[in-house]
């Protein structure tokens, strides 16, 4: 079988070279000849690398043994295929990230440019608005002036026309005398169009002045015929000739009529301006001032612009400026002060017929460890003293005791430690009777004397309770004798002060003490009105973790009920709960009862007065005013120094080292006592600076504040939560926990003593006499000396004496015995000595040797 048969049988074409492409083109020649020309088109074949895994991937590229391009490139770089792929991916990822960063950078730049353009546009709009308002104000003023001038001119023109008409009437009447029997009737003069327009407020321009009957105007020569196209149009020739009357349009006449109507309404029939009484406080915004005057804010702003001040609606004006604005707008000014918000907060005393007897409030005061809390425990049959840290009371406790006869007494247990002076002062101010507890074995102590002074300053009667009479070394008579030095004369010594010998341990004399209290209360005739809103004093406050701000209040008069709105110091809130000393919920609290309240927005300062107000708005207003005053008092800038002494004192104060501290305590009174004690420790060189002293546990904000201030945190009877502990550990903030105030004061005192510069003391050690002076080449002058007294040590301080006069004071540079350096030379021994930076040595001079020692300083107690 032939190849042709095979091809035909398989249906395939025979193999042949395919031309790259071509065709025939008819080519024309001169004289009508043409020829068919074969055209061949050549095409270029472009070789491209085959894709990975493609059909030709293993055969192309010229790699040895069918190796792929990727493997060849990897082998060329000394990498594996996976490493090359990873590198290519990393490069692609880096390029993509770079492209993303570039796009983000362009986007940020566009946003920044857009924001800058927006700010610039807002600034330009604000400037345009201010300029537009000024321009409108100026145009309004100019328009008013023009209207006034126009109305005046119209009035003068009307008067002139009326006078000319009257003259014409008189002249015509003289020419033609009327008949005797003929009745005179007013002659009606026809009004031309120009006069009608003038009456309506229009304006007519004439060449010869005002129109009216009179001599005939001089006739103008006839003009040549003009083009009708220029008819009715204003030309230069018409302006020069001026014989044609030109009038305003009907719309202009209508506007003039409306202006005249508006003017008549403003002068005669318009509404009258109302004069108001405007209350002007110490500071007020422009919008609020305009609202109180019932004026537009734009008018007030325009007025201030005329005065040369650029203000906005929310800008604050002082009282003097606001008063001038109100007076210029025609209103009555009523000046008030910010302190007026507290008017009526504490009412006057009640009428005697409305008062009822109340329980006395007793403050137990005295020196620390004299048994005040134990005496109260004996009266209440409780045991509180054993549960207190260190066995001392560190905040005021309020309790109410019911005696056997049914009489109730409210006790306030005040701390006796020296740090709680402010608490004792509050206790004396808030009570009716002071029980002065003095230990029979310890007699009068400093805090006893302080308690006496507090009671006398408050005018509170005193009952002396001589405690611990059961001890063998007790001497009650010595106590009463020592009290005479402080003007406390008891009844046993012909005085007026009651005294009772008691023992909290054996309960001796408790009945006599209660009888003395009842007698003193009966003499005081204590009464209060329970049927009124409650008023009283804040005894203590704290921030409880579960209950929030808690304040202990002593009701002096009235009845405090649940749900009422209370303002206590700079805090306010609605009473959510009333809790007595036993932890029981009460619906209300009457006079002489101490209760804890919940619901305030913060812990008030102890010693502040509290009262019930009628609305939340008034409570918020009073609290905001007090908080603002507190911020001004603590953050106000000191006035500039007016003398050299004040400037030097301030510079000296700036050089004082400060120890920053952050104090958190269980109650506000303890924080106040710690702050007062620590601030009194320092001197002119070092002092404690309390960054914050507040009740409540240590939280994260306290740690951050301590970190920024470089201060440790002192936690008194409180703990830090978990987040605060972790943050303090990360930031390196030290948190110290205390339960006794002694330890706080001692630690701070020791730390501040370490900050003091040590005291330098000079200690004399010996004398030496110069026998001969030698000049050494490298060393300089060296004195050959004999130690006459004491000892001379190398590096000690020296003074050169000549004729008992100190010529030089410095340090000993060299001390030699023969040719050897020695550490010291004793009396009777010769040595060689050289001074630092001094060589004026002579035979016979005396050398005084001394040492400077540093002694740690102590702070005064």
UniProtKB/Swiss-Prot annotation:
Q: Which UniProt keywords apply?
A: Cytoplasm, GTP-binding, Initiation factor, Nucleotide-binding, Protein biosynthesis
List positions binding GTP: 366-373, 413-417, 467-470
Q: What organism is this sequence from?
A: Maricaulis maris (strain MCS10)
Q: What is this protein called?
A: Translation initiation factor IF-2
Location of this chain's protein in the cell:
Cytoplasm
Region G5, as annotated, extends over: 503-505
Q: Lineage of the native species?
A: Bacteria, Pseudomonadati, Pseudomonadota, Alphaproteobacteria, Maricaulales
Where are the compositionally biased (Basic and acidic residues) regions? 94-108, 121-155, 163-186, 255-273
Ranges of biased composition (kind: Gly residues) = 53-65
What HAMAP family has UniProt attached to this entry? Answer: IF_2_B (MF_00100_B)
């Amino acid at each position: 079988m032939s190849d042709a048969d095979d091809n035909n049988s398989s249906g395939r074409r025979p193999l042949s070279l395919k031309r790259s492409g071509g065709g025939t083109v008819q080519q024309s020649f001169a004289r009508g000849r043409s020829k068919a020309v074969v055209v061949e088109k050549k095409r270029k074949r472009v070789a491209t690398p085959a894709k990975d895994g493609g059909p030709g991937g293993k055969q192309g590229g010229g790699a040895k043994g069918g190796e792929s391009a990727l493997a060849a490139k990897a082998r060329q770089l000394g990498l594996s295929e996976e490493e090359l792929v990873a590198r290519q991916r990393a490069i692609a990822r880096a390029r993509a990230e770079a492209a993303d960063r570039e796009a983000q950078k362009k986007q940020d730049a566009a946003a920044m440019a857009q924001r800058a353009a927006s700010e610039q546009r807002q600034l330009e709009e604000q400037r345009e608005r201010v300029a537009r308002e000024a321009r409108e104000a100026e145009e309004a003023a100019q328009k008013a002036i023009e209207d006034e001038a126009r109305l005046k001119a119209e009035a003068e023109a009307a008067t002139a026309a009326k006078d000319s008409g009257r003259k014409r009437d008189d002249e015509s009447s003289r020419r033609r005398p009327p008949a005797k029997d003929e009745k005179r009737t007013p002659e009606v003069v026809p009004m031309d169009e120009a006069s009608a327009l003038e009456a309506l407020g229009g304006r007519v321009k004439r060449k010869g002045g005002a129109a009216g009957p009179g001599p005939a105007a001089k006739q103008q020569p006839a003009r040549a015929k003009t083009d009708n196209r220029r008819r009715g149009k204003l030309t230069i020739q018409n302006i020069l000739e001026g014989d044609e009357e030109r009038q305003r349009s009907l719309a202009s006449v209508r506007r003039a009529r409306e202006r005249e109507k508006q003017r008549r309404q403003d002068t005669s029939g318009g509404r009258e301006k109302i004069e108001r009484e405007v209350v002007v406080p110490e500071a007020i915004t422009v919008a609020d001032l305009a609202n109180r005057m019932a004026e537009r804010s734009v008018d007030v702003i325009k007025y201030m612009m005329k005065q040369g001040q650029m203000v906005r609606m929310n800008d604050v004006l002082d009282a003097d400026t606001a008063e001038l604005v109100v007076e210029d707008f025609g209103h009555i000014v009523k000046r008030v002060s910010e302190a007026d918000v507290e008017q009526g907060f504490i009412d006057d005393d009640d009428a005697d017929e409305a008062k009822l007897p109340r329980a006395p409030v007793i403050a137990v005061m005295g020196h620390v460890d004299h048994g005040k809390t134990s005496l109260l425990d004996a009266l209440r049959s409780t045991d509180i003293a054993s549960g207190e840290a260190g066995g001392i009371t560190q905040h005021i406790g309020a309790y109410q005791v019911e005696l056997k006869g049914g009489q109730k007494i409210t006790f306030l247990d005040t701390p006796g430690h020296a740090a709680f002076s402010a608490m004792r002062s509050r206790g004396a101010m808030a009570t009716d009777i002071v029980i002065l507890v003095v230990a029979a074995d310890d007699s009068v102590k400093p805090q006893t004397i302080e308690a006496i002074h507090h009671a006398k300053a408050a005018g509170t009667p005193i009952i002396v309770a001589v405690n611990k009479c059961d001890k063998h070394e007790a001497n009650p008579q010595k106590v009463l004798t020592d009290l005479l030095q402080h003007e406390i004369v008891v009844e046993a010594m012909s005085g007026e002060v009651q005294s009772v010998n008691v023992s909290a341990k054996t309960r001796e004399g408790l009945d006599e003490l209660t009888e003395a209290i009842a007698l003193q209360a009966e003499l005081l005739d204590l009464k209060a009105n329970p049927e009124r809103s409650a008023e009283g004093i804040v005894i203590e406050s704290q921030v409880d973790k579960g209950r929030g701000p808690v304040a202990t209040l002593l009701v002096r008069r009235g009845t405090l009920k649940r749900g009422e709105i209370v303002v206590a110091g700079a805090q306010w809130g609605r009473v959510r709960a009333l809790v007595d000393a036993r932890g029981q919920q009460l619906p209300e609290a009457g006079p002489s009862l101490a209760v804890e309240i919940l619901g305030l927005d913060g812990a008030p300062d102890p010693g502040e007065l509290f009262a019930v107000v009628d609305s939340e708005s008034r409570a918020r207003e009073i609290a905001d005013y007090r908080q603002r005053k507190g911020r001004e008092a603590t953050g106000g800038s000191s006035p500039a120094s007016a003398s050299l002494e004040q400037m030097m004192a301030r510079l000296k104060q700036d050089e004082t080292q400060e120890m920053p501290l952050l104090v958190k305590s269980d109650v506000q009174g303890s924080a106040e006592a710690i702050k007062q004690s620590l601030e009194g420790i320092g001197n002119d060189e070092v002092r404690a600076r309390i960054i914050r002293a507040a009740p409540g546990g240590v939280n994260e904000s306290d740690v951050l504040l301590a970190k920024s201030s470089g201060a440790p945190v002192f936690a008194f009877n409180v703990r830090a939560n978990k987040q605060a502990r972790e943050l303090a550990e990360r930031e390196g903030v030290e948190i110290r926990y205390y339960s006794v105030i002694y330890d706080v004061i001692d630690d701070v005192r020791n730390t501040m003593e370490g900050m003091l510069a040590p005291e330098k003391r000079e200690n004399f050690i010996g004398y030496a006499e110069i026998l001969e002076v030698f000049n050494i080449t490298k060393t300089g002058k060296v004195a050959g000396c004999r130690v006459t007294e004491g000892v001379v040590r190398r590096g000690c301080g020296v003074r050169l004496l000549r004729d008992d006069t100190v010529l030089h004071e410095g340090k000993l540079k060299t001390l030699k015995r023969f040719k050897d350096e020695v550490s010291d030379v004793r009396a009777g021994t010769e040595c060689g000595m050289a001074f630092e930076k001094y060589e004026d040595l002579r035979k016979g001079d005396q050398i005084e040797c001394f040492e400077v020692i540093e002694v740690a300083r102590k702070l005064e107690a």
